[in-house]
Amino acid sequence: MAVETERYGDPEVREAVARRVGAEWGLELPDSFFRFADFLAALGPVEQRALRDLGLAPYGVMDLFADPSALPREGLDIRVHGRYYRDPPEFLTFLHGGTDGLHFGLWSDDGRLCDGVASYYTNDGDGIERCHRTPLEAVRARIEGAERDLADYAADGDEAELARLTDLGRLRAVLTGFETGERTETGLAYSEAYVYRRPPVDTARITTMDGAGALVTGATVLDRPPHGAADVHRFGTFMEDLLDDADAARAARDEALRRAVSGDPAEALVLGRDLHRASYGRAEHEAYASELLAVAYRELGRPALAEVAAAHHRHRALPDVDVLRRALSRPA
């Protein structure tokens, strides 16, 4: 949905978007989200072109800036606008990445407050990354990644790439006026300092197949390690094999439900997230995921996430994720 640039900075529009998101998703939009909107409002034609050249386009919840009262198409739920098949309920899309279904979302563990930014490629098997605290950090990383990749071509005197580097510099200058201005590194040096670093083990989260981890305490059937401590390949292979066995998947679901109704929803949450990630269009797995996530979020006091999960379950077979009434055009 095309958004006139000045609407990102319009106080009335911003307030209306915040109210709508709070009413529909239950999420309190963070200050960093509105700094991202300020950044978009500050872009001139050259900087807008540079953003497009990065493959980045505001999307999902950002479409509400065009019309905060926009309604979904008949019979659909607005909470699935921009919600891709494997998006966990904690993920709210705000930016499309242009290639292989790359998209970025605000991440909320409790469905009320934002806890950073997540991203992943919906068209491949990679997991979700949660290495950026804010939307502008995510954009800055893309700028520096592009500069790193263009540097060799520009060094050879390629005029088109030199022009792109100049445009990237102007885009960076606008962004650093809002955030990350203290980070003086650019290109490869920036990536090495802020992007390539392996994050520490997060003992507050439990390992999940989607790569994002689940914020929950309690016991799990496999005694799963904390987020960041597992061998990702071994864990993923084991879980894929388990879930491919219909009897084993059913038994795992039954045990998770038993634990949840006994007061420990940890297994229901992590297994529900795993099944959601690895449903692959299998109706039985989709149903198990929906059932487990519903009970887990209810027991954890996360009703907004329970509602998002239920809405997504109803609409996971949609051929596309553009559900607002005005026609949208986005790459798959």
Outline where the language-model segments fall.
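Mixed-charge (acidic/basic) macromolecular-recognition segments
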Residues: R140-L257
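Internal, hydrophobic cores of structured domains that mediate oligomerization or house catalytic pockets
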Residues: P68-V195
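A surface-exposed partner-binding patch
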Residues: M1-G111, A212-A332
